[in-house]
Amino acid sequence: MHPSMTLLAILPPLVRASIGNPHLLPTPPMGFNNWARFMCNLNESLFLDTAAAMLDTGLHAAGYTRLNLDDCWMASHRAPNGSLPWDPTKFPHSLPWLSAQLRSLGFSLGIYQDAGNVTCGGYPGSYGFEELDAHTFAEWGVDYLKLDGCNVSPAGAVSLADEYRARYARWHSVLGAMPHPLVFSESAPAYFVDPQNATAWYGVMDWVPAYGELARHSTDILVYEGEGSAWQSIMVNYRYNTLLARYQRPGYFNDPDFLIADHPGLSLVEKRSHFALWASFGAPLIISADVPGLSKEVIAVLTNADLIRVDQDALGLQATLASRSEHLDVLTRSLDGGDRLVTILNRGDGGLAVKVPVGWMGLQRCAYQAKNLWDGEIQEIEEDIEVQLDSHATEVFRVSLPPDCPMVIPTGIVFNTASGNCLTDGEALAFEPCRGQDLQVWQVEESGILRPLSRTSHCLTAIGDNVVVKPCTGRPGQRWTYHITGNLQNQHTGACLTEGTGIDVCGFELDSQVFGLPSGVDIEA
């Protein structure tokens, strides 16, 4: 075996849903969680009032049916038999009673626990009580578990990453043995985020999809009374999510955290962008807000049927970056039935006039219809979509493909997830800051051939220790394989694309060798 293939061969199997059953959660969850808005100030009345408001405002009818408790719901100590009681002051009628009440209204109850011996809020954790807690929750009528990762300490020579994996694997095993497994939301990756080196983070991300249905992968979104910019918090989690598209598919979803729909630091434009981006990602839509107090304008955003349809699309793909420049992101993905999603975000502080060519969408010149998913307006396009974007605004289009138009080719930037630099065609192939140019947009064919949009007669080619762009001839070195690890491996040489050296022996989740590619590209173990 080629030395560069050895590390890839020992990686975890290709992403699969928890319990081996993608039907447990075929589409992202939608609902409510108290944490970002109320933190530990949760109680029975909050959840009943939230349920009533969701029924009255149309949120329930739109699909928001999960009401999830977060930390601090439990008593301060376990019972003598080891079981975990609820706080009787916060939940005087009991959690089984609350679960039954919510179920009678058409909702389901989710719950929070922690993989350590103590939760983040200082309450009893699940370590050593996994099976007892799982069956207790099921007896209460709970069908969704968010497992946090505070206070996890390895013993002896065990690494921290291995300890997390063992504890989440234990929960996976317990849930898998139950007649009706709970949906399993894993927070393990969030404890390995390191802006200086992502190797450990990706190492955890490689296994979480095998154990659960969704993962809280990075920093917590800003809470209601937190300090700092709510918009910047959204953008931080947005960025992390763009690095992880390769993991997502039906049955497993990347979770960039809650929709903070009533945060006082957000304008309505920013709230619209928050929702549109999460829907474009196919991310969980979990509202953390004072739902009875939401304005009609915000309710209209959260119940946008066209965007919810995108979020719940059966293909389960995540939108990826087709193009990026200093202030502008264009994301695309394919939808069930053949339509193409185009999402355009202005990250800058001023307005932008934007033209998005059909080539960036993975299309060729033809007659298409593009529906604006905010106002429903349909426009005929052949060459591009033109749009005016206010600061921090996001427009979303659903492009219908007539049967006589060419098929979609996955198209977008090939970017290093650590540096953010784009693979750039030119006299000398290089990684450069992304500038929103065809030189940095690549078509990725099913055969493994990559062509720059600037000259589609040429292909990314490995020659010896170098990687260049040469005329496409079918020569050895012009076919590549994209791995779940983010490695782009040449099928002829066995080496991996590497920022800084061009191509090199494949390592394990090295920052220089992990790349984001367009949505829809085939992914190998």
Curated annotation (Swiss-Prot):
Record-annotated disulphide pairs: 40-72, 120-150, 422-434, 459-472
Q: Is the keyword Amino-acid biosynthesis assigned to this protein?
A: no
List of glycosylated residues: 43, 81, 117, 197
Sorted alphabetically, which Pfam families does this protein's record hold?
Melibiase_2, Melibiase_C, Ricin_B_lectin
EC no. given is 3.2.1.22
What is the reaction catalyzed?
Hydrolysis of terminal, non-reducing alpha-D-galactose residues in alpha-D-galactosides, including galactose oligosaccharides, galactomannans and galactolipids
GO:BP terms for this protein?
A: carbohydrate metabolic process
What are the UniProt keywords, alphabetically? Disulfide bond, Glycoprotein, Glycosidase, Hydrolase, Lectin, Secreted, Signal
Claim: 4Fe-4S is one of the keywords in the record: no
What this protein is called in its record is: Probable alpha-galactosidase A
Q: Record the organism.
A: Aspergillus clavatus (strain ATCC 1007 / CBS 513.65 / DSM 816 / NCTC 3887 / NRRL 1 / QM 1276 / 107)
